[in-house]
């Protein structure tokens, strides 16, 4: 059956700021306390979406979350009106204010793990929300992510959206950023490659930075998504590269159809894994980048592998890269050699995503890949699909509500909270989402 990959991109939120919240993500740590530009960040993301949509790649949008997220501050013991809660936390524990104001939901590669209908036992598209248990600021995302996904994939006959796994370290799940699908045409059954960093009873794990994904979580997600057990491979990421800042697999590998583009040191027991994929995926092609050409450090600093590998109708592929790749002589030299070599990659497309990149999120972090048949695509909430009208409406919305300068101190401004809620109210109507945000269901929550 014919099917297409639709990229659902996260829209950057109004409180996008640099707080260094993500230990193990070296860009996040390095840019801590710098001044951010939320308006520019949102527009950079929108331009990527629209450019790819115009090039013929189906594209949709996932909206930001409510931030600062007052209900969690109340759980932490701060009381009074919303304004009083903000004032108290800013004075007594500003680190909590930064955490509950993170715009990290923009990186929707961590929102959920997807199983297309061609891979599932019941013939539905399955989406399991990620619990993002390893980082407090990200662990807050799952309930609203679930509401948003149910508002977008709202036809229960075609889509099953599953709640996140229990919030415990043993079941740490980071979503599609640790998941690849390999195979032929999108509508054919594919091989799902789940990548984990640690498992109970296995001493092979990183020592410097945390391994966020567990094998136990990956196995549970595969079950929830009803993936045919014959179409699943579990593989461990190389713990040494996690210790070099590869906090998700999509920082060191990206797949599309029959191609796996990865670093030579991406996986534990890599030659064994690639042999397994060759045996089980027709036409499988591994493009392994040697460490002698691109070091892990350079891969992390440029986000070479946090790229999007997109298929054209003629079978050729386009690699979507952040500008940092073009600015690095060694990486750009390698990429031009890659273009000349015998493989499906025939074009490099570069985007300026500096605002997201400075927090450790490249092109692949910003998108959730969902393979859909034509019938399934028609069943998606049409208001989220990118086109000229939506692009213009979202740009106008960003111009109206987003600030062009934000520091950590600004997060305590009650006006920022009010601006954010008004903006999301308008956006949820624009995207026909219903009341997906807690403040909408609580009537504002200003008392």
UniProtKB/Swiss-Prot annotation:
Tell me the route in metabolism or biology where this protein functions: Amino-acid degradation; L-arginine degradation via AST pathway; L-glutamate and succinate from L-arginine: step 2/5
Q: Set out the biological process GO terms recorded for this chain's protein.
A: arginine catabolic process to glutamate; arginine catabolic process to succinate
- InterPro entries from the UniProt entry: AstB_sf (IPR037031), SuccinylArg_d-Hdrlase_AstB (IPR007079)
Q: What is its EC number?
A: 3.5.3.23
Report which superkingdom the organism of origin falls in. Bacteria
Q: Which GO terms describe its molecular function?
A: N-succinylarginine dihydrolase activity
Q: Which residues form the active site?
A: 174, 248, 365
Please list which residues make up the signal peptide: none
Q: Where are the transmembrane segments?
A: none
- Name the family the entry cites: Belongs to the succinylarginine dihydrolase family.
This chain belongs to the protein called N-succinylarginine dihydrolase
**Gene that encodes the chain:** astB
């Amino acid at each position: 059956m014919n099917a297409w990959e639709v990229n659902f991109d996260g829209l950057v939120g109004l409180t996008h700021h640099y707080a260094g919240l993500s230990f193990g993500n070296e860009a996040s740590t390095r840019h801590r306390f710098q001044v951010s530009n939320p308006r520019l960040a949102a527009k950079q993301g929108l331009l990527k979406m629209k450019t790819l949509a115009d090039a013929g790649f189906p594209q949709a949008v996932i909206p930001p979350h409510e931030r600062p997220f007052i209900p969690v501050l109340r759980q932490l013991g701060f009381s009074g009106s919303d304004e009083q809660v903000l004032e108290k936390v800013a004075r007594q524990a500003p680190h909590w204010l930064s955490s509950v104001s993170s715009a990290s939901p923009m990186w929707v590669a961590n929102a959920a793990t997807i199983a297309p209908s061609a891979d599932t036992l019941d013939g539905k598209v399955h989406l399991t929300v990620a619990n993002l248990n390893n980082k407090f600021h990200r662990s807050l995302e799952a309930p609203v992510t679930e509401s948003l996904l149910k508002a977008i994939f709202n036809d229960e006959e075609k889509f099953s959206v599953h709640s996140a796994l229990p919030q415990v370290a043993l079941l740490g799940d980071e979503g599609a950023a640790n998941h690849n699908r390999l195979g032929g045409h999108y509508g054919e059954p594919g091989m799902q490659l789940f990548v984990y960093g640690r498992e109970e009873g296995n001493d092979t794990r990183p020592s410097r930075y945390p391994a966020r994904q567990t094998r136990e979580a990956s196995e549970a997600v595969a079950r929830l998504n009803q993936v045919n057990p014959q179409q699943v491979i579990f593989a461990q990421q190389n713990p040494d590269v996690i210790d070099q800042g590869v906090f998700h697999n999509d920082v060191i590998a990206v797949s599309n159809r029959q191609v796996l583009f990865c670093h030579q040191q991406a996986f534990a027991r890599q030659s064994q894994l690639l042999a397994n994929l060759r045996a089980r995926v027709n036409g499988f092609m591994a493009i392994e980048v040697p460490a002698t050409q691109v070091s892990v450090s350079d891969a992390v600093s440029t986000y070479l592998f946090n790229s999007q590998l997109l298929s054209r109708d003629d079978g050729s592929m386009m690699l979507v890269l952040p500008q940092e790749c073009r600015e690095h002589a060694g990486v750009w030299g390698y990429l031009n050699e890659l273009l000349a070599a015998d493989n499906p990659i025939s074009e490099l497309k570069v985007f300026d995503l500096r605002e997201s990149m400075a927090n450790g999120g490249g092109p692949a972090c910003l998108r959730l890949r969902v393979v859909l048949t034509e019938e399934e695509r028609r069943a998606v909430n049409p208001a989220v699909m990118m086109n000229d009208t939506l692009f213009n409406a979202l740009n106008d919305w960003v111009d109206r509500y987003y600030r062009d300068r934000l520091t950590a101190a600004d997060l305590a401004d009650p006006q920022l909270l009010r601006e954010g809620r008004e903006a999301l109210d308008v956006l949820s109507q624009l995207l026909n989402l219903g009341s997906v945000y807690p403040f909408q269901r609580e009537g504002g929550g200003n008392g």
